Amino acid sequence: MGNTVAMILAGGQGTRLGVLTERIAKPAVPFGGKYRLIDFTLSNCVNSGIYRVGVLTQYRPHVLSKHIGIGRPWDLDRKDGGVEILPPYVGRHESDWYKGTANAVYQNLEFLEENDAELVLILSGDHVYAMNYNDLIDYHLLKEADGTIACMEVPIEEASRFGIMITDVDGRIVDFEEKPAKPRSNLASLGIYVFNYEFLKKVLIEDENDPNSSHDFGKDVIPRILRENLGSLYAFRFDGYWRDVGTLRSYWEANLELVLPVPPFNLYDPNWRFFTHTEEMPPAYVAPGSKVSTSLVSEGAEVYGNVFNSVIFQGVKIGRGTVVKNSVIMTRTEIGENCYLENVIIAENVKIGSNVRMGVGEDAESKLDPKVYSGLLTVVGMNSVIPDDMVIGKNCVIGIGVRPEDFKSKTLESGDYVIVREE
């Protein structure tokens, strides 16, 4: 099938995830009790036998770069091939940063040359899915295509969030529009492409020299290939599980789907394992008298209270008499005694005092940003401390690094927020 090199676009800011991505890139966001979002794409690569991988970073890359390291958890610490972090070649000007997804790959054509790329697999590092990329590549070769885009049908009311394509009866793409206001189809791009290298190189160089281009695959490169008939593009229909967890609501829902009796996304398939870089921790402990049901509880967690329909990450401690419902609690967060938390997302290393009630009260629109904070979820940023006896409503936001003295009273009404700005 030719020498395939994967390029993972991992520079996304993920602004719709609010405080969860204020200090880290979206692909580094924790997910599913022990993983980070990029783990799924990296694992798909190695499970598909693809061991030449470039990770293109940009926004807040430190946590992501540290997480990937030399790639050992994914068997990517190799002399021949392996994983390489590819930041932008930043000079003295901000314009030296990646200007778009196409420009990011263009800036790394030398990496592709060094790895003797014949096929280039372009992937997003912030989606949750399991895909054997060989199926995509086999289809691409069968069609003798210049490029192939993985796609799936989505509800027509959601189609304007995606790149939307129209195909002929043979699966060849005849039209493509990025996030159309009035979509003419519901066949959505998954942001997963395979290109013949020489073809990709040619169109990227041409795009780079186009002063009117924003240098993005979906907005510029794909439409131009079709408009000017530069090559053949085909649609590969994927019928497996795929989630774009780009909003707080979709992130929360995708986590809680994992606890269903028959989860739509299978973390337990021995033939398609997901790998990650985590700290070694002892087994989880559930104390006498505690109740845990329909939940994921990761290693190192200590549960002295009650947990229902929730995802509990590594090293989390839940105090006696505390109830956690429909929530996502991230690594090393500690919750005191006699608390009640419902419909909350708590980031890493948060300390919650005793007798705290969170996610309660009347419904209310967010006073901070209704476009980001909606769906009545209360969100707490990393490294915050919430004092004893607080009552925090629905759809509230506690920012990163908030301290007890930052709260003006013991009550935070639904829709309200406490944010401490960086110095």
From Swiss-Prot:
Pfam families: Hexapep_GlmU, NTP_transferase. Alpha-D-glucose 1-phosphate binds at Y98, G163, E178, K179, S189. It catalyses: alpha-D-glucose 1-phosphate + ATP + H(+) = ADP-alpha-D-glucose + diphosphate. Pathway: Glycan biosynthesis; glycogen biosynthesis. Transmembrane segments: none annotated. InterPro entries: ADP-Glc_PPase (IPR011831), ADP_Glu_pyroP_CS (IPR005836), GlgC_bac (IPR023049), GlmU/GlgC-like_hexapep (IPR056818), NTP_transferase_dom (IPR005835), Nucleotide-diphossugar_trans (IPR029044), Trimer_LpxA-like_sf (IPR011004). It comes from the Bacteria. Keywords: ATP-binding, Carbohydrate metabolism, Glycogen biosynthesis, Glycogen metabolism, Nucleotide-binding, Nucleotidyltransferase, Transferase. Disulfide bonds: none annotated. GO terms for molecular function: ATP binding; glucose-1-phosphate adenylyltransferase activity. The keyword ATP-binding applies. Its EC number is 2.7.7.27. Gene3D superfamilies: Hexapeptide repeat proteins, Spore Coat Polysaccharide Biosynthesis Protein SpsA, Chain A. GO terms for biological process: glycogen biosynthetic process. The keyword Kinase does not apply. Involved in the biosynthesis of ADP-glucose, a building block required for the elongation reactions to produce glycogen. Catalyzes the reaction between ATP and alpha-D-glucose 1-phosphate (G1P) to produce pyrophosphate and ADP-Glc. NCBIfam families: glgC (TIGR02091), PRK05293.1 (NF003670). Homotetramer. PANTHER family: GLUCOSE-1-PHOSPHATE ADENYLYLTRANSFERASE, GLUCOSE-1-PHOSPHATE ADENYLYLTRANSFERASE-RELATED. Belongs to the bacterial/plant glucose-1-phosphate adenylyltransferase family. This is Glucose-1-phosphate adenylyltransferase. It comes from Thermotoga maritima (strain ATCC 43589 / DSM 3109 / JCM 10099 / NBRC 100826 / MSB8). The lineage of its organism: Bacteria, Thermotogati, Thermotogota, Thermotogae, Thermotogales.
